[in-house]
A protein has these predicted regions:
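Canonical P-loop GTPase G-domain recognition
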Residues: 42, 49-104
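Helix-rich effector regions associated with P-loop NTPase G domains
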Residues: 1-14, 18-20, 25-27, 34-43, ...
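Walker A/P-loop
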Residues: 102, 107-108, 112
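Charged helix-capping and loop-helix junction motifs
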Residues: 29-33, 58-60
């Protein structure tokens, strides 16, 4: 439990995916962003499941304050809403990793970007907690030539030697 685990390496962009449903947690998002900033990759915040959240505008405003200089996009991976804006990050030879808690919709987003069902997905439980359907990291080549790395959902994230993001 006390050991440090490397989440991803050699990536250009990290999509930090947070569900706008019951998964939304601003403090956890701050921890993700601190880790991203410390790691040196370009961070992009994706607020997913916009179709399930009537409070999306308020949560977007809160997230923009926390994200500071990082871009924030509201999307619905399941319905395809807002996903087209991600093409600017998915350029040829760019490696993009997805980070977020279980149930945030990372694998659904992978399927949407790839244009086909490559990753198994499940409905989120009634309490909005994920089911850990993705259990290992997996790489995919996108139609535009980017490398997309899907990662298992994280139950928790703690900061280790992160100075810049605090």
């Amino acid at each position: 439990r006390d050991r440090i685990q490397v989440l991803v390496a050699n990536v250009d962009v990290i999509f930090v995916v947070s569900g706008l449903d019951g998964d939304f947690n601003l403090r956890r998002l701050e921890r993700y962003l601190a880790v991203v900033r410390e790691g040196g990759a370009k961070g992009v915040v994706l607020l997913n499941k916009a179709d399930l959240c009537p409070e999306a505008p308020r949560r977007l405003a809160e997230t923009i304050l926390v994200a500071r200089d990082l871009p924030v996009h509201v999307i619905s991976a399941k319905k395809g809403e807002g996903v087209d804006v991600l093409a600017q990050y998915l350029t040829p030879a760019t490696t993009v990793a997805l980070l977020g808690s279980s149930g945030a919709g990372k694998s659904t987003l992978v399927n949407r970007i790839l244009g086909r069902e490559k990753q198994a997905t499940k409905e989120t439980r009634e309490d909005s907690r994920g089911r850990h359907t993705t259990t290992s990291r997996e790489m995919f080549l996108t139609p535009g030539g980017a490398i997309l790395l899907d990662t298992p959902g994280l139950r928790e994230i703690q900061l280790a030697d992160v100075a810049e993001g605090l």
